[in-house]
């Protein structure tokens, strides 16, 4: 657990060289540390609804969890050059992290859950508590009961099953009242019910046909990728842990250090679904999340304990000094805390 103090900013692509040169002179780091992280965003697949009782505090909440590891594009990624599509094809690729042919591949994963930043009008910087756990996982292929879509296509919509018990009870009560009041109209009611049942049967047939078509399309697209009934062991681990994958993104950038302050300059990339056949086999085409080639900047300090007021005040002062020193280069600001809220909203 760490207590993180942070400020954020952004710069245009044309200001990247000037910003890097200034930070190199300011920090004394001629060769900044490269950043190449892959983040898998997961969500609890079972909603927990605590029983509310008077006189008891029920602040039990569920959170989205980030699973972070490193990635490589297999070539030198020049951040100084803009990422532009040429003839509809991407020039940025990532190797597949979850592939059916990979066996006994070890990767370091960081599981991260973050609380919403502290609220307040007099906050000088964003302050939030982050819980992390790092593990080394050996990726293998395991058998699964369900043959899901390609493991890298994590942006899937999971439909919830609706309860029909309440509707059936209401229909039964209505039928009883109608039978008591209108005994002479039983024949007409039966005819109407027969028509409704026939319509329902026809609708069910149409739905079954549509489901068969969808399943056949999925098997054609992904059967060669994942194999029948197999998937990556890390995805199986997340499923056993109670989480399902909902999104993914890649980060590429550089990192500077100034005392206890970490300064990161990076771009966010996502999967490019428009490129159906990448130039390089076994790799995924990527595109910028912000096509304007804007760089994101994040400066932060990690405090060991959220109760250490002296270190928190000292870290806040250091961030404010950095903000004042770099005000002519870029403006460091407090991010909106509502966009950093990772709590799962429960629908009542």
Swiss-Prot record:
InterPro entries: Mediator_Med18. GO terms for molecular function: transcription coregulator activity. Gene3D superfamilies: Hypothetical Protein Pfu-838710-001. Its main location: nucleus. It is found in: Nucleus. Residues 167-223 form a coiled coil. Residues 152-218 have a biased composition (Basic and acidic residues). Residues 152-227 are annotated as: Disordered. GO terms for cellular component: core mediator complex; mediator complex. Pfam families: Med18 (PF09637). Keywords: Activator, Coiled coil, Nucleus, Transcription, Transcription regulation. GO terms for biological process: regulation of transcription by RNA polymerase II; termination of RNA polymerase II transcription. Component of the Mediator complex. Belongs to the Mediator complex subunit 18 family. Component of the Mediator complex, a coactivator involved in the regulated transcription of nearly all RNA polymerase II-dependent genes. Mediator functions as a bridge to convey information from gene-specific regulatory proteins to the basal RNA polymerase II transcription machinery. Mediator is recruited to promoters by direct interactions with regulatory proteins and serves as a scaffold for the assembly of a functional preinitiation complex with RNA polymerase II and the general transcription factors. This is Mediator of RNA polymerase II transcription subunit 18. The gene is SRB5.
